[in-house]
Amino acid sequence: MALRVYPTATLPRFPSTLSLRTTKFMVKSSNLQLQMQSNDSRKLVLEVKEKLENEYHSLPVGRNGRDDEDMILWFLKDRKFDVEEAASKLSKAIKWRQDFEVSNLTEESVKDIAQTGKAYIHDFLDINDRPVLVVVAAKHFPKAQDPADDERLCVFLIEKALSKLPTGKEEILGIFDLRGFGAENADFKYLTFLFEVFYYYYPKRLSQVLFVDAPFMFKQFWRLVKPLLKS
């Protein structure tokens, strides 16, 4: 995941074609299907699938479940095709999705917190055809807003971004608009949640993060949270 700081004048450009909004999210298979034609990859996917069935039988099946071969392959790639590590990490991710009730998240369920404008999916893909998740830091007030609502909005928007992936694309772009960021917007706990979500449950989905117009105060705050980043 690449991190870059942009001044206001050089905000990334977006193409002029509007992407369709959706309320029901189905993550497109992209080129994972093509990769699975590799005999070695296919063999490893089946090994993980069998391991999950034998050792984590209580986990759900279906899309984003223990028999979802696209998801299995993605976690194998994340774990450098180590079957044991992929099965372990994926089992925890599936259990988390179940506990967090990810499948029940809807536009309506996050409507109130979304109306603050603190985060949203941009209407356009970026110039590399990646869905764009925008965070407006100056609208985040941890002392006045329910952290559980913030977490649900975060996961809902990640799911929404992934549902907009064009065929052949697998990653999204994150933009943090830091104009007006102050001490009242700093939230160490929420950033910890954000890092953990992308590392454990959506690994390698966030390809790049751009910080726009970062003030000095944020740079000091970032020095404290940067050690939390995992490769």
Question: In which residue ranges do the predicted regions lie?
Answer:
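SEC14/CRAL-TRIO lipid-binding/transfer domains and related phosphoinositide-recognition modules
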Residues: A2-K204, Q208-V212, M217-S231
